[in-house]
Amino acid sequence: MAISTGSTSTGSTPTGSIPTGSVSNGSMTTHRTPVSATATSGVVAAKAPISPATRLRTALATVCISGALEDKLAAAAAAGFDGVEIFEPDFVASSWAAAQVRQRCADLGLSIDLYQPFRDFDSARPEMLQANLRRADRKFDVMRRLGTDLILVCSSVAPDALDDDDRIAEQLHQLASRAHDRGLRVSYEALAWGRFVNTYERSWEIVRRADHPALGLCIDSFHILSRGSDPAGIEQIPGDKLFFLQLADAPYMNMDVLQWSRHYRLFPGQGTFDLPAFLGHVLAAGYTGPLSLEVFNDVFRQSEPQPAAVDALRSLLALQESTLGRLPLPDSVEAGSGTVDSAAPGSSLAALSGDVGVPEPPTAPPVPALGGFAFAELAVDDASRPAVAGALRAFGFRHCGQHPTKPVQLWQQGGARVPLNFSPDGQQSTGAAVAALGVETEDPVSAAARAQALLAPVLPRRKGPAEADLAAVAAPDGTSVFFCRTGADDATSWLSDFPPTSDATSTDRGTDGGAGIGVSHIDHVALTQPFDRFDEAALFYRSVLGLQTQHSSEIAAPFGLVRNRAVADPSGAVRICLSVSVLRRGSEWQPGVTDPQHIAFATADVVAATRAAAEAGAPVLRVPDNYYDDLDARLAPLAQLLEAMRELGVLYDRNADGEFLHLYTEVLGGRVFFELVQRIGDYSGYGESNSPIRMAAHRRQRTGAGQHAG
């Protein structure tokens, strides 16, 4: 917990710096070796098997992140990338000469793996072809000064584009010959919106007909998967003709593919494309060049570049881990002086390195099996403390533990534990806030090691001599995530830091402690994310904790669109709901709740629990009669149940899998509230359709309007 272990949550977003000893795709961040300008990385024998001599490097297109070119290069290097793609508009806008860019990359340990893009080359007009060849010669001059040997040529979208494979092949042959004479190569890519060439199958046929050693393919996951093409055919392409690989994820969207590509690409693992399968096909073809990210995203290009670059590298590490299990590798291979177990998650393709001077990286332990929430810690100040503690008491929680040296109380009912942290160091902001989450796992040390290997910032801690030894990392929004093995009778359990209070009973410290109102455990925690950290948070929880996306939704809230994404472990023991406002225009017309957070407690009978809580003075959120009239029309719950829900303010949802009853409290301390939930059958949702009702009710509470609506 933030104060009981000495780590603090100040509300500032983690910088994204790599923990000491973390790795970058097969090389320690202090041992990157630049690739020479004449290197031919990416060209291997056809169908070359994955072997100890194979080393897959990582690269980041400068277009992925914000800032000037110098900012982007620094961020890529700090994150641990091996190389970059120089996006031509970034270079043209830079005050640095090509030689300066080359030297800066060398100083940072970055190779320049690609110069891109060269657009609209082929032409039906002879004079335009000559102009394009002249333009290419000038770009080749730039490439030589930059120290890169590979240029990306996109299929044409121009009105004079050719629809003749033989003529396009002939023109590309001319281009490749000019490049070859200067020690350079050309990588041809089919844009998904190309005028005529818009599939990888056709681009490969053109390259095959051109038949020039300096001409190969660039394979881009977005251009292929956005069109619904089958990537399995990539395996039939000779590996020595796969010059470059660009990776991007994306959500499935029914829109113009150009707009989809330019605004909504994501890092691997953040969207819905099956990139592990895609990468597996590319590697099966014999590709061993860089794994490069080319992601156009409006949010990423507004965000701080260094955290975005760290998120990008984390996505590649997780992708390699996911892909590895699908490849027909032997049980173990020798890598340098060590052995890499191909069955171990994290013994990624990057670890299959025989490069001299490149150490074998430590492998990431497997995804931890989670046993639920150990706790959800709230930071409170003097103003919010009475309201939060009062609501917990009305919900049947007991103050059953007190840290002996730090201002942290432990409140518990059943297996639901809520530490209240009164320390100024633990406060993310004024009022109340979720400061930390504890997740149960049998091997906290392994779970923490995995988090660090996946570039999660390890939090500093201040541990007393008799305190439990806990490890924590920072989520993208600054929330601390602890790995716990609670074990009530275990002296190393974090519970040992909280001697019982006089309010505790003999059963309070177990998972069935305290009768209360019937709360059994924490069902889920909901966290609003900063605008530029929503996708990063989903990737963090997916890669570090193994939480998979259950579903995503968009809600028409009273003050704008809210995007939700629910993630959970396979058993449903740990569920986290992430949300973000799609657009934010300030607070002058948003007198509701800023960045709300809430903790949901599970119960077997929400009506009985709510009645008991209300009688104890719980600040139950009032729901208007209009909701229940509409509910009766839509879902027609039993009349007795409907009347009880109307009386108590309980909300309801139902689908083919089951039913969901839930109740909210008023907002406590500015942004935090509680929820009681009852799941019936196999219902796995969160009652999202009721969210606008809750948001409007919270606004009424905050403004004092509609006090008599009932």
Regions found by a protein language model. Give the residues of each.
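N-terminal pre-domain/capping segments
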Residues: 2-5, 10, 25, 31-148, ...
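Glyoxalase I/VOC metalloenzyme domain signal
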Residues: 25, 35, 39-44, 54, ...
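Acidic/histidine-rich catalytic cores of soluble enzymes
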Residues: 83-84, 174-272
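Conserved, mostly hydrophobic/aromatic
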Residues: 76, 84, 105, 143, ...
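Acidic-and-aromatic substrate-binding clefts and catalytic sites of carbohydrate-active enzymes
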Residues: 63-70, 87-98, 120-130, 158-163, ...
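Hydrophobic faces of well-ordered beta-strands that scaffold small-molecule active sites
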Residues: 56-62, 84-86, 112-117, 151-153, ...
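Active-site acidic/histidine proton-transfer and metal-coordination neighborhood
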Residues: 32, 46-52, 122-216, 307, ...
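Alpha-helix-loop-beta-strand connector modules within alpha/beta enzyme cores
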Residues: 101-118, 169-181, 206-212, 273-278
